[in-house]
Amino acid sequence: MKVKYLMLTLVGAIALNASAQENTVPATGQLPAKNVAFARNKAGSNWFVTLQGGVAAQFLNDNNNKDLMDRLGAIGSLSVGKYHSPFFATRLQINGGQAHTFLGKNGEQEINTNFGAAHFDFMFDVVNYFAPYRENRFFHLIPWVGVGYQHKFIGSEWSKDNVESLTANVGVMMAFRLGKRVDFVIEAQAAHSNLNLSRAYNAKKTPVFEDPAGRYYNGFQGMATAGLNFRLGAVGFNAIEPMDYALINDLNGQINRLRSEVEELSKRPVSCPECPEVTPVTKTENILTEKAVLFRFDSHVVDKDQLINLYDVAQFVKETNEPITVVGYADPTGNTQYNEKLSERRAKAVVDVLTGKYGVPSELISVEWKGDSTQPFSKKAWNRVVIVRSK
């Protein structure tokens, strides 16, 4: 009989240990950004403005007969855009300048062509996509594609001898962090601008930018620029943790410790020696153990899965008529003044549930809020909390 009891105990212990193993899931900060969910940023967050200067040149046909260095003309660009995630952005770029065209076997004939253009681009940060997200990363590699419009003209008269065309644009940018809000950027891009919408004609009724032999070509342009990128508004993204694995691991550890204690107690003798009767002295003291109500990032709405804690608090107050204290907190993300207001809203939201939903008398509730000046827990996410305790 003892052998059977021992075997059953061992089998049960093995099964219980297997069911309470720790979750060893990597933290979001260790995963590539493509595998992490990020909170949606606000409308005014993660905007940027880029100012650049550089050179441009025409390619293909007789243009290639001229040495590249002799083809270069000065250009400038202005870009305004926004990052929608750590690795995806859109922008509008306006650029313009010189892009002279060359004819002849040696490119001896030069035509003073200039341009002004605008294109809308879709940008992809390769480094942020494949690496764990860090707002202070030094280097970024950002290829992009876009579509736009270009106005080409000869000489200095914008409206004379001109061509209006759609463009297909492609390029790559390298960004080097200089500070929280400034990057040094280098960019190379190409524009196919032979998708003509309209064109002017010369005195001979021949379209500008054309010649009978088909040697004149002004439809493929390369550009290289460098400059500064300025970040505007709130900078960076916050990862969303769907569950707190550290808390789950801690709870599993407590379960395993309790099971070990139960197993140890089961080894003690069934019978105990007789003890003299002692008249119990009963002293009742009503104390509420601390109850924690957790909140989502930048939220003061009480989630449904937190209502059980507030129900327990309400039952305690109704049964004992003891006063309680409600204290709101916030994690250190953001500025101190905002966190102070956020912790106040969280504390008052808990009071509203206690009084409005569960009928706790308001005169038995004291309300406090401490912003991020006090962090009751070592883990950042746990401090998005309201703690309820006996007064």
Swiss-Prot record:
Domain of life: Bacteria
Chain positions with Pyrrolidone carboxylic acid modification: Q21
Keyword Plastid: no
Membrane topology: Multi-pass membrane protein
GO molecular function: polysaccharide binding; porin activity
Subcellular localization: Cell outer membrane
Chief location category: membrane
OmpA-like domain ranges (all copies): 282-391
One Pfam family named in its UniProt record: OmpA
Signal peptide as annotated in the record: 1-20
Keywords: Cell outer membrane, Disulfide bond, Membrane, Pyrrolidone carboxylic acid, Signal, Transmembrane, Transmembrane beta strand
Cellular component aspect of the GO annotation: cell outer membrane; outer membrane
InterPro entries named in the record: Bact_OuterMem_StrucFunc, OMP_bac, OmpA-like, OMPA-like_CS, OmpA-like_sf
Family label: Belongs to the outer membrane OOP (TC 1.B.6) superfamily.
Quaternary structure annotation from Swiss-Prot or TrEMBL: Disulfide-linked heterodimer with Omp40.
Role, per record: May have porin activity and function in peptidoglycan binding.
Name of the protein described by the UniProt record: Outer membrane protein 41
Organism: Porphyromonas gingivalis (strain ATCC BAA-308 / W83)
